[in-house]
Swiss-Prot record:
UniProt modified residues of type Phosphoserine: S70, S155
Highest rank taxon of the organism: Eukaryota
Recorded family membership: Belongs to the gemin-2 family.
A GO BP entry: spliceosomal snRNP assembly
InterPro entries xref list: GEMIN2 (IPR017364), Gemin2/Brr1 (IPR035426)
Compartments in which it is found: Nucleus, Gem; Cytoplasm
Pfam families: SIP1
Subunit structure: Monomer. Part of the core SMN complex that contains SMN1, GEMIN2/SIP1, DDX20/GEMIN3, GEMIN4, GEMIN5, GEMIN6, GEMIN7, GEMIN8 and STRAP/UNRIP. Part of the SMN-Sm complex that contains SMN1, GEMIN2/SIP1, DDX20/GEMIN3, GEMIN4, GEMIN5, GEMIN6, GEMIN7, GEMIN8, STRAP/UNRIP and the Sm proteins SNRPB, SNRPD1, SNRPD2, SNRPD3, SNRPE, SNRPF and SNRPG. Interacts with GEMIN5; the interaction is direct. Interacts (via C-terminus) with SMN1; the interaction is direct. Interacts with SNRPD1; the interaction is direct. Interacts with SNRPD2; the interaction is direct.
Keywords per UniProt: Cytoplasm, mRNA processing, mRNA splicing, Nucleus, Phosphoprotein
Gene: Gemin2
Name used for this protein in its record: Gem-associated protein 2
Gene Ontology, cellular component aspect: cytoplasm; cytosol; Gemini of Cajal bodies; nucleolus; nucleus; SMN complex; SMN-Sm protein complex; spliceosomal complex
Major site of localization recorded for this protein: nucleus
Role, per record: The SMN complex catalyzes the assembly of small nuclear ribonucleoproteins (snRNPs), the building blocks of the spliceosome, and thereby plays an important role in the splicing of cellular pre-mRNAs. Most spliceosomal snRNPs contain a common set of Sm proteins SNRPB, SNRPD1, SNRPD2, SNRPD3, SNRPE, SNRPF and SNRPG that assemble in a heptameric protein ring on the Sm site of the small nuclear RNA to form the core snRNP (Sm core).
Length: 269
């Protein structure tokens, strides 16, 4: 069996793309100066390639990677429901069936509702306006007061600028998928540091109803984040009869069972 030089073995794995004819450059060839002819250039490339190691291992400092990491993806599931808080399987199945009907209706009548004229006081923010959407959905009063909720003082009329606009079909039908995903992210960020409110619940339900399948990766991550946060807040609710419990259960149910995130589903009570 003939001996095969190491360079030939490498060339079998990395074949030449351009043929290079052998040339005699022994006279006057100086590899330290810029090449003057095509032959000198190709010869210089061959010399530099021969000096490179066959295998290069990058020395990576894990501490630097960890320090510069900007996105944290949690694969953990939802917090288990406290005793007596988890909904029955029948209830979850009923909610999924009703939600499916709502989504079909929204899709069917989207063009109709989109054509309806909005009231003069409805000014929808641009997709990238996070603060604008928070105020639009939750109201300037709630955004200013944090998680304390809107004032219950009676007023002669509803000031939607202060209390937030509800997710009317004439509003959500005007939102494309980019805006829906963005608003879902904005409200999820808000919810991540605050308590659950009816305003949040209504908007989360409407946004999920308008979210198209198959989900984009960003939307997939956001709805899982939403379900996990709902389970965390549910742990802090002092009574199973609290009105927040069925609303939180509903959002967890829709994310896990309608959008097929089964690892987040509640175990039936």
């Amino acid at each position: 069996m003939a001996w095969v030089p190491a360079e030939s073995a490498v060339e079998e794995l990395m074949p030449r793309l351009l043929p290079v004819e052998p040339c005699d450059l022994t006279e006057g060839f100086d590899p330290s100066v810029p090449p003057r002819t095509p032959q000198e250039y190709l010869r210089r490339v061959q010399i530099e390639a021969a000096q490179c190691p066959d295998v290069v291992v990058a020395q990576i400092d894990p501490k630097k990677l960890k320090r510069k990491q900007s996105v944290n993806i949690s694969l953990s599931g939802c917090q288990p429901a406290p005793e007596g808080y988890s909904p029955t399987l029948q209830w979850q199945q009923q909610q999924v069936a009703h939600f499916s009907t709502v989504r079909q209706s929204v899709h069917k009548h989207r063009n109709h509702w989109k054509s309806q004229q909005l009231d003069s006081n409805v000014a929808m923010p641009k997709s990238e306006d996070e603060e604008g959407w928070k105020k639009f959905c939750l109201g300037e009063r709630l955004c200013a007061e944090g998680a304390t909720g809107p004032s219950t003082e009676e007023s002669p009329g509803i000031d939607y600028v202060q209390v937030g606009f509800p997710p009317l079909l004439s509003i959500v039908s005007r939102m494309n998928q980019t805006t829906i995903t963005s608003v879902l992210e904005y409200l999820s960020n808000w919810f991540g540091e605050r308590d659950f409110t009816p305003e949040l619940g209504r908007w989360f339900y409407a946004l999920l109803a308008c979210l198209e399948k198959p989900l984009l990766p960003e939307a997939h991550s956001l709805i899982r984040q939403l379900a996990r946060r709902c389970s965390e807040v549910r742990l802090l609710v002092g009574s199973k009869d609290d009105e927040r419990v069925p609303a939180l259960n509903l959002l967890i149910c829709l994310v896990s069972r309608y959008f097929d995130q089964r690892d987040l589903a509640d175990e039936p009570s």
